[in-house]
Amino acid sequence: MEESQAELGVEPPLSQETFSDLWNLLPENNLLSSELSAPVDDLLPYSEDVVTWLDECPNEAPQMPEPPAQAALAPATSWPLSSFVPSQKTYPGNYGFRLGFLHSGTAKSVTCTYSPSLNKLFCQLAKTCPVQLWVDSPPPPGTRVRAMAIYKKLEHMTEVVRRSPHHERSSDYSDGLAPPQHLIRVEGNLRAEYFDDRNTFRHSVVVPYESPEIESECTTIHYNFMCNSSCMGGMNRRPILTIITLEDSRGNLLGRSSFEVRVCACPGRDRRTEEENFRKKGQSCPEPPPGSTKRALPSSTSSSPQQKKKPLDGEYFTLQIRGRKRFEMFRELNEALELMDAQAGREPGESRAHSSHLKSKKGPSPSCHKKPMLKREGPDSD
């Protein structure tokens, strides 16, 4: 085959070239040349060294470098419980200390609203919440006002109220003064001091008491609540109370008052919903003093006014009916209605008079066995 192609002078296609021809096409400094094999041999240890090393350490395996230990996931932080639960009982003291709030409705646009029936403040995250301080007589100089949050339910009271880890790490709403873990802040007061009690671990914020301005009867402090009530890792839907105390310069108590707080997205809606539920439960009715007798509420049947009897219509109407069969049907229907009126006792005298009038007007009813005789008039009759 090759000889025949050589004789004809036709070159074979590439697929028909021999292996020797392809080998000659490779460059001289190929990967399989002996020049590149020498450095590789130098990298390998001599056989004598390997034998010596195995004889010296027969029981030791080659030690591989240990991989760096993976950073273990940090466990959930368990904050220490407080051994001190502050009192939440209202104490006006000698100065008649009490709190007040601005009147606001339940519109969706409100950012802060107070419910007097619930003694509860509804507000949005980091929004201004004005709290009024009322006193009957001015307290001594150096008096301070402290605000502290505690959990309302008994099973949570020993836990410290703090912000959620998400809000603690967030740089939003950071003023550079308040610690990131504090829930309550004071807005617009550079004299505010934030305390972390070393013994009770409670968080509080203290501001100096300022006398009311001219033509004003109360002092107003603007608070901010820096975490939602529904935040996981924080309040986690647990109700909280804010305790406002009036203290002298030595920390002695002069007055105390408290209110519940809910930090939510729509304060007006939540206030309206909780007040409706409160009224449905009947808790809005004040309890009678001890020793007083409760009056039973009248039953609904006796309290409801009696329905007035509608007088029977005394008018009479004449209805022309075509066909005796239809007439009998309407007559029976009318008698049934008259009987119902008589049994109901509505205007019995008038019903009897009305039925007698119908009988006299109708005349004797034809017998069902006798066919009434009707005179047929022909076309010639007058």
UniProtKB/Swiss-Prot annotation:
Chain segments carrying region Oligomerization: 314-345
Modified sites of kind N6-methyllysine: 359, 361, 371
Biased composition (Basic residues): 354-373
Coiled-coil features, chain-numbered ranges: none
GO BP terms in the entry: cellular senescence; circadian behavior; DNA damage response; entrainment of circadian clock by photoperiod; negative regulation of cell growth; negative regulation of DNA-templated transcription; nucleotide-excision repair; oligodendrocyte apoptotic process
Cofactor-binding details, from the entry: Binds 1 zinc ion per subunit.
Region described as Required for interaction with FBXO42: spans on this chain: 101-225
Locus of motif [KR]-[STA]-K motif: 359-361
Record region (Transcription activation (acidic)): 1-44
NAD listed as a keyword: no
Region entry Required for interaction with ZNF385A, spans: 88-289
Protein's name in the database: Cellular tumor antigen p53
Species this chain originates from: Ovis aries
Record lineage: Eukaryota, Metazoa, Chordata, Craniata, Vertebrata
